[in-house]
């Protein structure tokens, strides 16, 4: 950092140094900029570069005010220097290496002479000039680069070193490459130890390159262009972009080399032609002598083509030239696009050595070129190795950086290509990788991003984080692996499985469950999109939390709640789901233990059974509620995240409970068996169930009353909340005392909750209908709700226990209905508010809990449209928070029980 700071300060000082005309030294004129570039960079850039900078100095004047500010200078000068940066660095490194090169060159000259037959180590300043020419003339650069590829292939000398023997004899030697190659082969045999590694790398490349060897050997820009196109098609566009910078770097390097190796560009142009000739001959020889040429010409032609491609083809081609191995990879992935799967491994293997940098590629290339130099001359080999070392250095920064990125990108891309070849869908791969990433923590976000309900994703994040922590152990990995390996498929499958579980319920309650089925069927389809929204918030909590069952549950729950996510837009089932969730979660929050216990089984059953019925009614009522619930849910769901968000998660918990209820019903049927054995439990649950049905119906009765009665309902809510709080504490005590009864209670209660939720879902309507509906309608509705529950339960679970439970529920429901009828009559006599208060308070504790949260939260939702009472809303907000907090726990318990019961 101190060095960086000094460098930055040096830049600033340099800027101010030349900004003399400005008293503040804050701006530069075009003349001062020219002076700055000449004074500071004149040693690195040729006059043509400085002239180009001067000519294009207006580019630095971003704001066109004739003055170049420091920020403009920094931005623009680095854009200009970007092409020259590597050249500068390569020049610096080449200067250091050129010191050592003469020795190597002396040794290599002999080899080069032997290999090239000329032994003429024509310091190819022209190569760099040719490269220099490349910026000016890409066509010649393609030719020059072929020359370079030929000459460099033969005498691959660092262009930085001016050691590229653009030896036409070298070309002849390349024409004589077979011989030279054999000689070089001998030299290679001598350098095999070195070459083995490099050749192994090269062979890995050559393996990948061999399919490409012909093209790379030929190194015909067209072939590579085609390959580059393929590669670019397969994702080399980023690589191309990177290669563009690399090409620029190469050109900059070339230009830098030209600067250091200023020589007649004529040689460059001449050598391009000769390079073309050599190239054709190389192609011939490379085609003839593919194994050696593959190793030699491929590296050389690859390297030659690399600049050539860089110049003639495109940055992407240059990428491949710079990334010949990347090209090999890409060709492996592309030509082996067929072999993409194998190529990724090869390219990965190549990439692995290349992981430390495409410098390793360049090193391998250097090794290849070393092989070539060995073939073409060990001097050239060392030179080419030095060249590539320099290129590594030059490219090293970017080659290591961009090449490393490209390697990673291409490794991932080969993987992507593999998966593409495997899946045939790159997007699916992205989806899988995203799903993997999502699995890694964006799972909820993935779902939520799909769901798009991000308030729920937040809830998901929190609840899921907790429940995932707990239930991820159980099945989050499975759930997300499943849901994300086949994110849409398995989720949809799981959701559809759950939906199928619910399907009988949905089918039976099709009319009623139209939205339920929508919330299940559509969400199954939409689950991918919506499951992230609402399903995730609550269910992702439970889904991710207890993703074993929640996978399906997440699907179903994602279904119902995902459509509930849709329904937030719809506002019906979302408000329903939210109200269900609220009532359920409210009940859960109020009776977390009881509901956690009971919720898994019958709660979910009841949720499913009642949810269809409740939803069927809720479809009607929530249609009434839709507008208020939508507005409320929108207001409270997104707005008041306390009640709304918790409610939405609760709505999802409803779906979760209904979906979890599928499994929970299964698991809790077992639990229900024991729980059913206890008539007290059944009685409690049944009494609470009718209570909830009554409260639901009562709420329904309360619902239709009107907005005025909503105000009363709000007051009733407040009173209910108080009475419900008392009842909640009492019922919690009772339920905690009789946890098993509570379990069956809650199981029964779950239907009641569902009924209550339905009531709460209806509760907006109930709010509207608070005391306007007679108790008989409440009984009827309760019966309807409970009948669908029993029917759905029977449909979903036709077990005798379930039937037995249903019978007891019906019996006790009748008893409780009678009691509640009396209470309702009394309450109705006392008034709608008293009705709601007395009924909800008299409703079974669990139902009171559910009704409490249901009434409070649904009221909060229903009321926010018209008269959202602050008390009701505030209370639901804590309840929503409790639901958020307690519900995940309840869901956890429920999901844990579900998991345990499912395991059982």
From Swiss-Prot:
Cysteine pairs forming cystine bridges in this chain are none
Q: Which residue stretches does the UniProt record annotate as biased composition, category Basic and acidic residues?
A: 172-185, 222-240, 268-300, 349-371, 385-398, 759-770, 881-890
Bias type Low complexity, positions: 555-578
- Endpoints of the signal sequence: none
Report the superkingdom from the record.
Eukaryota
In the record, what terms sit under GO molecular function? Answer: transition metal ion binding
Region (Disordered), start-end ranges: 102-792, 858-890
Gene3D superfamilies from the entry?
EF-hand (1.10.238.10)
Question: Which part of the chain is the EF-hand domain?
Answer: 48-83
The Polar residues compositionally biased stretches are: 113-128, 443-452, 538-554, 586-598, 771-780
Cite a single Pfam family from the UniProt record: S_100
Task: From the Swiss-Prot or TrEMBL record, give the protein name.
Answer: Trichohyalin-like protein 1
């Amino acid at each position: 950092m101190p060095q960086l700071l000094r460098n930055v300060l040096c830049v600033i000082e340099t800027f101010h140094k030349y900004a003399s005309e400005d008293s503040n030294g804050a701006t530069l004129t075009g003349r001062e900029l020219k002076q700055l570039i000449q004074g500071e960079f004149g040693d690195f850039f040729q006059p043509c570069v400085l002239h180009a900078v001067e000519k294009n100095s207006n580019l630095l004047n971003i704001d066109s005010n004739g003055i170049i500010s420091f920020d403009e200078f920094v931005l623009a000068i680095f854009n200009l220097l970007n092409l020259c940066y590597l050249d500068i660095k390569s020049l610096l490194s080449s200067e250091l290496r050129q010191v050592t090169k003469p020795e190597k060159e002396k040794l290599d000259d002999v080899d080069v002479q032997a290999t090239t037959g000329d032994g003429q180590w024509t310091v190819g300043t022209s190569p760099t000039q040719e490269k220099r020419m490349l910026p000016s003339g890409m066509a010649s650069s393609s030719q020059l680069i072929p020359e370079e590829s030929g000459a460099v292939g033969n005498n691959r000398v660092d262009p930085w070193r001016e050691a590229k023997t653009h030896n036409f004899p070298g070309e002849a030697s390349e024409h004589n490459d077979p011989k030279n190659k054999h000689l070089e082969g001998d030299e290679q045999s001598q350098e095999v130890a070195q070459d083995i590694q490099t050749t192994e790398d090269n062979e890995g490349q050559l393996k990948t390159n061999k399919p490409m060897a012909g093209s790379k050997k030929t190194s015909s820009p067209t072939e590579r262009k085609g390959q580059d196109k393929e590669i670019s098609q397969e994702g080399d566009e980023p690589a191309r972009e990177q290669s563009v910078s690399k090409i620029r770097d190469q050109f900059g390097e070339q230009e830098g080399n030209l600067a250091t190796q200023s020589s007649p560009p004529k040689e460059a142009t001449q050598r391009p032609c000769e390079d073309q000739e050599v190239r054709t001959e190389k192609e011939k020889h490379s085609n003839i002598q593919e194994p050696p040429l593959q190793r030699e010409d491929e590296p050389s032609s690859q390297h030659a083509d690399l600049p050539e491609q860089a110049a003639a083809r495109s940055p992407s081609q240059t990428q491949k030239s710079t990334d010949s191995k990347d090209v090999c990879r890409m060709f492996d992935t592309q030509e082996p696009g067929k072999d993409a799967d194998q190529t990724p491994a090869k390219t990965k293997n190549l990439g692995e050595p290349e992981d430390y940098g495409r410098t390793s590629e360049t090193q391998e290339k250097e090794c290849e070129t070393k092989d070539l130099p060995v073939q073409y001359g060990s001097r050239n080999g060392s030179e080419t190795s030095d060249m590539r070392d320099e290129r590594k250095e030059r490219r090293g920064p970017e080659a290591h950086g961009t090449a490393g990125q490209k390697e990673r990108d291409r490794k991932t891309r080969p993987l992507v290509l593999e998966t593409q070849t495997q899946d045939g869908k790159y997007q699916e791969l992205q989806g899988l990788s995203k799903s993997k990433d999502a699995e890694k923590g964006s799972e909820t976000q993935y779902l939520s991003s799909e769901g798009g309900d991000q308030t729920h994703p937040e809830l998901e994040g929190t609840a899921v984080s907790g429940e995932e922590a707990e239930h991820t152990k159980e099945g989050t990995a499975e759930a997300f692996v499943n849901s994300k390996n086949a994110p849409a498929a398995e989720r949809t499958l799981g959701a559809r499985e759950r939906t199928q579980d619910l399907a009988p319920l949905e089918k039976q309650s099709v009319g009623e469950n139209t939205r339920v089925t929508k919330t299940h069927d559509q969400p199954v389809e939409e689950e991918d999109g919506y499951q992230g929204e609402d399903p995730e918030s609550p269910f992702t909590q439970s889904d991710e939390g207890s993703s074993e069952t929640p996978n399906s549950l997440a699907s179903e729950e994602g279904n119902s709640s995902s459509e509930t996510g849709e329904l937030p837009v719809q506002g019906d089932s979302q408000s329903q789901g939210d109200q269900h969730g609220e009532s359920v979660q409210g009940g859960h929050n109020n009776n977390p233990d009881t509901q956690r216990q009971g919720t898994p089984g019958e709660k979910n059953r009841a949720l499913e059974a009642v949810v269809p019925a409740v939803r069927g009614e809720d479809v009607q009522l929530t249609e009434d509620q839709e507008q208020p619930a939508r507005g409320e849910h929108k207001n409270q769901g997104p707005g008041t995240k306390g009640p709304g968000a918790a409610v939405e998660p609760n709505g999802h918990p409803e779906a979760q409970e209904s979906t979890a209820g599928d499994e929970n019903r299964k698991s809790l049927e077992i639990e229900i068996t024991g729980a059913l054995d206890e008539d007290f439990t059944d009685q409690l649950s049944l009494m609470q169930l009718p209570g909830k049905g009554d409260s639901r119906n009562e709420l329904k009765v309360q619902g239709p009353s009107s907005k005025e009665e909503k105000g009363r309902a709000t007051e009733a809510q407040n009173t209910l909340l108080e009475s419900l709080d008392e009842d909640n504490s009492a019922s919690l005590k009772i339920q905690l005392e009789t946890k098993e009864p509570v379990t069956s209670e809650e199981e029964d209660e779950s239907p009641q909750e569902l009924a209550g939720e339905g009531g709460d879902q209806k509760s907006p309507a109930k709010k509207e209908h608070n005391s306007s509906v007679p108790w008989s309608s409440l009984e009827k509705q309760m019966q309807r709700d409970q009948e669908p529950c029993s029917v759905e339960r029977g449909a979903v679970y036709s077990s005798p226990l379930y039937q037995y439970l249903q019978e007891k529920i019906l019996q006790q429901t009748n008893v409780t209905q009678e009691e509640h009828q009396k209470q309702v009559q009394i309450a109705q006599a006392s008034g709608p508010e008293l009705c709601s208060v007395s009924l909800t308070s008299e409703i079974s504790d669990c139902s009171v809990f559910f009704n409490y949260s249901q009434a409070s939260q649904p009221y909060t939702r229903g009321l926010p449209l018209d008269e959202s009472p602050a008390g009701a809303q505030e209370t639901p907000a804590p309840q929503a928070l409790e639901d958020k907090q307690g519900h995940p726990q309840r869901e956890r318990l429920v999901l844990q029980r579900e998991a345990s019961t499912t395991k059982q």
